[in-house]
Amino acid sequence: MSWIINGASHDWEVVIGLEVHAQIVSNSKLFSGASTEISVDPNSHVALLDVAMPGVLPVTNEYCIVQAVKTALALSCEVKKYSVFDRKNYFYPDLSFGYQITQFYHPIAKNGHIMLDESADNKKIGIARIHIEQDAGKSLHVGDKTCIDFNRAGVALMEIVTDPDLRSPEEAAEYLKKLRIILRYIGACSGDMENGALRCDANVSVRKVGESALGVRSEIKNLNSIKYVAQAIKYEAMRHVEVLESGGKVEQSTLLYDVDTGTTRTMRSKEDVCDYRYFPDPDLLPLEITDEFIASIRDTLPELPMAKMSRYMNDFSLSRYDAVILSSDRDVAEYYDEVMQRNLPGDLVAAWVTGELFGMLNKRGMCISDSPVRADALGDLLRLMVDGTISGKMAKQVFATMFETGKSASKIVEEEGLQQIADEGVLSAMVERVLEKNPDKVQQYKQGKEKLFGYFVGQIMQETKGRANPEVLNALIQSKLSQ
């Protein structure tokens, strides 16, 4: 949904484009054999190439290309058969080469999209291009000194660039959430923004409602959380409107967002393309990608979140809410799918996974991959409940014991004698005894005090320690009281 800012003289439409830098999951860097592990001592994983030592040439890491092609396919992009690495020339202390190896003229993929608002108008956010590039090092400021850690230098990145299709901070946030889910699903990027594995630059401009030409844009760099992306866009759009409404002119610039003040500040004036003097890297051969190579990667793609969500809603009759929760995390979805192999009701399994299981995991700060109750074990428990061996109340008790001990549901039920009593003869005798002991309450019930029905049920549940089958018991009591 478009965000329209009401100014004193005009209504303004916000136009947003995002550039997402996704760190590729790979054991080694893009052009050197150094490890990509960065949570170690500074400058521990640095090859000669990473610090631009003379005489060392780059060698392309094929696995990074595979990951980029996989991402392109997952985002419905056109994978280019011919792709070239270029040099982007600029100076920065943590960029030893004096240039960044990236792709400008011939990126690896173009023309993809992500769908937003599936429940409403299915808005399509275009992805203009995906290109591969190397990351820079990290500057660390200590007092009046600046130290540089080159562990990150040369790590492979994908820059995923949208068309200027986003129209509000909320749409930008939703796009980022969906992109991160997809990247995690296919294993191309961890998506951990707090660790810098996913960073976002937001391009923001405004224009008068009804105009087609784009306004002058500001680029907000290195936003490391979805919340800050939305906040920064909102502030910058309002600033643009304030400048224009007062008769001023928005200057093209590169900005940083200050999370403490909630404002942007100028980092540098925005460069034009010509300032970077792009040209093909003479040390690297072009990438020539075949149809067979693309097909082999396509075969490795998992069922993607949108398709999985639709399947859950169509095949298992799940609500949209449950389908979104279950499909948004690949580990959760695989857990749910494995439980469903027991031919159980889809809504029942969804309720248990998102309710009982998530509740236990959250209390202990655990993720589903660490759950002591595996998917097959939960399936066995729910099968006992569906088959009538134990009641729903008993199932929760058994589940808690399973979580603490790791024992199977059937073993716990056997050891604790929790099997439901469903024998009509046994329960009928109990019902008769309870009614005979309470003739006054039977009379009151027949005179219209129907709440006493729960009293009779409670007496038998107390006698059986909750093991009486509720359906059988209710039917028997109803039958006896109607005589």
From Swiss-Prot:
A single MF term (Gene Ontology): glutaminyl-tRNA synthase (glutamine-hydrolyzing) activity
InterPro entries xref list: Asn/Gln-tRNA_amidoTrfase_suB/E, Asn/Gln-tRNA_Trfase_suB/E_cat, Asn/Gln_amidotransferase, Asn/Gln_tRNA_amidoTrase-B-like, GatB, GatB_C_1, GatB_Yqey_C_2, Gln-tRNA_amidoTrfase_suB_CS
Gene3D superfamilies reported for this sequence: 1.10.10.410, GatB domain, N-terminal subdomain
Residues annotated as transmembrane: none
Catalysed reaction, written as an equation: L-glutamyl-tRNA(Gln) + L-glutamine + ATP + H2O = L-glutaminyl-tRNA(Gln) + L-glutamate + ADP + phosphate + H(+); L-aspartyl-tRNA(Asn) + L-glutamine + ATP + H2O = L-asparaginyl-tRNA(Asn) + L-glutamate + ADP + phosphate + 2 H(+)
Any single GO BP term: translation
Swiss-Prot/TrEMBL keywords: ATP-binding, Ligase, Nucleotide-binding, Protein biosynthesis
Annotated EC: 6.3.5.-
Reported function: Allows the formation of correctly charged Asn-tRNA(Asn) or Gln-tRNA(Gln) through the transamidation of misacylated Asp-tRNA(Asn) or Glu-tRNA(Gln) in organisms which lack either or both of asparaginyl-tRNA or glutaminyl-tRNA synthetases. The reaction takes place in the presence of glutamine and ATP through an activated phospho-Asp-tRNA(Asn) or phospho-Glu-tRNA(Gln).
Quaternary data: Heterotrimer of A, B and C subunits.
Family: Belongs to the GatB/GatE family. GatB subfamily.
Protein's name in the database: Aspartyl/glutamyl-tRNA(Asn/Gln) amidotransferase subunit B
Organism: Anaplasma phagocytophilum (strain HZ)
Recorded name of the encoding gene: gatB
